[in-house]
Amino acid sequence: MDVLLGRDETMDESDYLHVNNTCAPSLGLSIARDAETAINTVIILIGGPMNFVVLTTQLLSNRIYRSSAPTLYMTNLYFANLLTVTMLPFLILSNRGQISSSPEGCKLVAVTYYASCTAGFSTLALISVNRYRVIHQSTNKNAAGSKKKTYGVLALVWLTSLMCASPAPTYVTVLAHDGDTPDSVHETCIIFFNYDQVKTVLATFKILICIVWGVMPVVMMTWFYLFFYKRLKLTSYRRRSHTLAFVSTLILSFLVLQTPFVGIMIFDSYAVIEWDVTCESINSRDAVAMLARVVPNFHCMLNPVLYAFLGRDFNKRFMQCITGKLFSRRRMLQERAGVRSPSTPHRAARQLAKIGTLTRSCSRSELQRSASAPPPQ
């Protein structure tokens, strides 16, 4: 959602904002907007179906297989990513003035987008912490208690994410663009700040996003990777090489995307605080920030590949979902029971043979006893 700076604003009877003095977009800002639209379109077309397929497979699998803490964290990650991708079409069309909404609708989209992004990054941190506990073998043996605790942690994550996203809807409104012709009149959802709020409210908002979406995930992932590599040296070479390659792919792909994002957000926060509020500086900063805000959306396209399709367990369950086995819980449980005891018919035949042998031997002993018994008087 675009951030607009202006002064001398007025509200009409529909609570639509009319700004009399704003900066005209520069050529660089227009190019950045087109690039953002193209990248987000690719993310929607690829990341949306992938997250839907992965989330559906995970939910169906949780009905049959016992769900552990990592499984629930993965399910929450795919749900948060799918929710983020779902908001992108509205944001793209609204930024281009091709769709309009009420101020309440814009506020709902804003809080949903920022909360789902925050929940996604928080879930990645939870997955790292859970793997840290697995390495230390400090997982809870009580499955029921651990599952309840996991649900409580996820509820706390979403509550915290909503609290972190709550400042955004406060400044979200609808901007009415008054054109020369009726066809050129349109509305867009924006985050509006007056010039007097730039170095206070907007700077705080930028710093909060930089910390929650940038610094904290990078620090968490870097710490986990260094600790995991140190602990992995104690294991065998075969297990170490396979596990290290998998974890390196996860962590390094995250850091390659996230580290430039942190640098750009730190620069953006510095520019908001130190630069003068002029049209040239506003357009330059907005062009950089516009490309930086597609980085959180990139994770929605990469997470299903890294955390789902690169794993053997998920690929096995995905094939079960394609063949329709996960849709019938009774059928799947019967097949799993049959796999566990493949020699049941042979065992039953051997048991019947033993019973027949015992019956024949018992009949012979009874005949011998009856033959040796004295006749009745």
From Swiss-Prot:
Q: Which UniProt keywords apply?
A: G-protein coupled receptor, Glycoprotein, Host cell membrane, Host membrane, Membrane, Receptor, Transducer, Transmembrane, Transmembrane helix
Where is it found, in Gene Ontology cellular component terms?
host cell plasma membrane; membrane
PANTHER family of this UniProt entry?
Answer: CELL ADHESION MOLECULE, G-PROTEIN COUPLED RECEPTORS FAMILY 1 PROFILE DOMAIN-CONTAINING PROTEIN
Annotated transmembrane regions: 34-61, 72-94, 108-129, 152-170, 207-226, 247-270, 288-311
What role is this protein assigned? Plays an important role in vivo, in particular in the dissemination to or replication in the salivary gland.
Main localization is host cell
Report the Pfam families cross-referenced here: 7tm_1
**Glycosylated residue positions:** N20
Its localization reads: Host cell membrane
Protein name, per record: G-protein coupled receptor homolog M33
- Extracellular face of the membrane: 1-33, 95-107, 171-206, 271-287
The way this protein sits in the membrane is described as: Multi-pass membrane protein
Q: Which residues lie on this side of the membrane: Cytoplasmic?
A: 62-71, 130-151, 227-246, 312-377
Q: Name one GO molecular function term.
A: G protein-coupled receptor activity
InterPro entries cross-referenced by the UniProt entry: CCR1-9-like, GPCR_Rhodpsn, GPCR_Rhodpsn_7TM
| Family recorded in the similarity comment | Belongs to the G-protein coupled receptor 1 family.
